[in-house]
Amino acid sequence: MLEILYQDEWLVAVNKPSGWLVHRSWLDRDEKVVVMQTVRDQIGQHVFTAHRLDRPTSGVLLMGLSSEAGRLLAQQFEQHQIQKRYHAIVRGWLMEEAVLDYPLVEELDKIADKFAREDKGPQPAVTHYRGLATVEMPVATGRYPTTRYGLVELEPKTGRKHQLRRHLAHLRHPIIGDSKHGDLRQNRSGAEHFGLQRLMLHASQLSLTHPFTGEPLTIHAGLDDTWMQALSQFGWRGLLPENERVEFSAPSGQDGEISS
């Protein structure tokens, strides 16, 4: 069962778990766990995608309950009328607030994108980022005696493939758990010492104008246990009040206070 964050007669939003595909492609024909099919079975209605989240990313996934609803939502995404907010745990101390305007060359998959043009130049890519908190943990990683992490809020203003992951890697603050653009030593250390066994990138919030009612709509997605455990271990509880789960209890030996 997927957590349904919002549903009306036109739209449905779920909290996509890390590791789930949004829908099958011919490359993933045998995949058993797929968001679209699970939601369809769960609510007894066909759903229509309007945007995507990478497989390792968790958080708000918004779909239409008709082809028209899906089309109108997709149009809003394409025209950048929907505000997306993400949170990430990154390597090092990223403390400033700034806008990164750094064009990206399209990443092509050798199989899935074999018919795509390879001669496209860099495409505009803009991300607003803001450091929320930092921590230094007494765990050696590589040649350093301690390990530093940062909690970052991200708002992509464009929608390039892997944009947030690539932009943070460009800033030399790759997201923990990013196997393609990240720091392998940091990924291993985070998994071994702090249970960061996934890409630490979460789609926390979507804000839009409802395509049928015209009313403002904001949808929040709660954090999973890996995220909640990280916030507890790093002393960051209470920094993401709209996404932290009040029912989470930290493992023994860690800060187990419940925030409200």
Curated annotation (Swiss-Prot):
Keywords: Isomerase, tRNA processing. One of its GO terms (cellular component) is cytosol. Coiled coil: none annotated. The active site is at D54. PROSITE patterns: PSI_RLU. Pfam families: PseudoU_synth_2. Its EC number is 5.4.99.26. It catalyses: uridine(65) in tRNA = pseudouridine(65) in tRNA. InterPro entries: PsdUridine_synth_cat_dom_sf, PsdUridine_synth_RluA-like_CS, PsdUridine_synth_RsuA/RluA, RluA_PseudoU_synthase. It is an enzyme of class 5 (isomerase). GO terms for molecular function: pseudouridine synthase activity; RNA binding; tRNA pseudouridine synthase activity; tRNA pseudouridine(65) synthase activity. The keyword Isomerase applies. Changing D54T: Loss of activity. It comes from the Bacteria. The keyword Cell wall biogenesis/degradation does not apply. GO terms for biological process: enzyme-directed rRNA pseudouridine synthesis; RNA modification; tRNA metabolic process; tRNA processing; tRNA pseudouridine synthesis. Belongs to the pseudouridine synthase RluA family. Responsible for synthesis of pseudouridine from uracil-65 in transfer RNAs. This is tRNA pseudouridine synthase C. The lineage of its organism: Bacteria, Pseudomonadati, Pseudomonadota, Gammaproteobacteria, Enterobacterales.
